[in-house]
A protein has these predicted regions:
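C-terminal long alpha-helix characteristic of the crotonase
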Residues: 23, 136-141, 191-242, 255, ...
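CoA-thioester-processing core
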Residues: 102-108, 116, 122-175, 204-208
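Acidic, divalent-metal-coordinating active-site segment for phosphoryl/phosphodiester hydrolysis
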Residues: 178-184
């Protein structure tokens, strides 16, 4: 990717913000957008200065999901094509083979990814938000799984992730009906917080992201994210305890831990 046409991104210190950026189509999802998103994430993953990534949409939408022109093309072909080239970047791949597929690979990234759902969010865009580590939304943002009203099954792992966020009963409602709900009406567990409007949302998310980037150790965040993912994929509490003890033992020999303890004892903010 040498010329971003469907996305854009900016760096502000240790926080990167990515916009899904096709405002003339309400940021409708295309293979080009997906490819660009993967390229940006791969570039950010390679930059050790980046500690937090925010994903949002160019107003007024987050993303209305699959572009209708692309959907019509699937009808003509009679099959599905993601539109992503086979040699596209694969950020987040390699941590665990069970994550190495499109959006679930977000969990393999070293930094937290925060979804700021500022407006309409449908289909694959909802899946993108769900696979982010944290999710915040504007109260009036409209959400839908969309697929059943197109005659399609659940897409991009929504049948796996939604029950884990909101429970099987609420997930079944959203996945089977495809009905539209606002973020304010969404089942508990989908969002970390719902803000009154898009402006308040972006301000809140940027404050949260800056705090996350500056007040906690980046190695600790990366390790904790890996613990969360590992424990979600297994049913073995004893293994989780053993893994946490191993990670704590390793962390206590690092400069990051020494700084954290020094800051605590000196009653000052840590300088990570």
């Amino acid at each position: 990717v040498t010329d971003l046409k469907a996305t854009r991104f900016e760096l502000d210190g240790a926080v990167a913000t990515i916009w899904l950026h096709r405002p003339h189509r309400h940021n409708a999802w295309t293979g080009r957008m997906h490819t660009e998103l993967r390229w940006i994430l791969a570039e950010l993953e390679a930059d050790p200065a980046v500690r937090v990534v925010v994903v949002t949409g160019t107003p007024p939408a987050f993303s209305v999901g699959g572009d209708s022109q692309a959907l019509a093309g699937h009808v003509e072909r009679g099959s599905y094509d993601t539109g992503v080239p086979v040699d596209a970047r694969t950020p987040g791949y390699g941590l665990d083979a069970r994550l190495d597929a499109e959006l679930s690979a977000l969990w393999g990234l070293r930094f937290p990814v925060i979804a700021a759902v500022n407006g309409a969010c449908a289909g694959v865009a909802l899946a993108l938000a769900c696979f982010c580590d944290l999710r915040f939304a504007a109260a009036g943002a409209k959400l839908t799984t969309a697929a059943p009203k197109l005659g399609l099954p659940a897409e991009y792992g929504l049948s796996w992730i939604l029950p884990r966020l909101v429970g099987p009963t609420h997930a079944a409602d959203l996945l089977l009906s495809g009905r539209v709900v606002t973020a304010a009406e969404a089942p508990y567990g989908l969002f970390n917080a719902v803000l009154p409007d898009p402006e308040a949302l972006i301000a809140h998310v940027q404050d949260y992201a800056r705090a996350l980037a500056s007040t906690v150790g980046p190695a600790a965040v990366a390790a904790t994210k890996r613990q969360l993912v590992a424990d979600l994929l297994r049913h073995d509490p004893a293994a989780s305890v053993r893994e946490s003890l191993r990670r704590m033992d390793a962390a206590m020999g690092t400069a990051e831990y020494a700084e954290g303890v020094a800051a605590l004892r000196e009653r000052r903010p840590p300088r990570f």
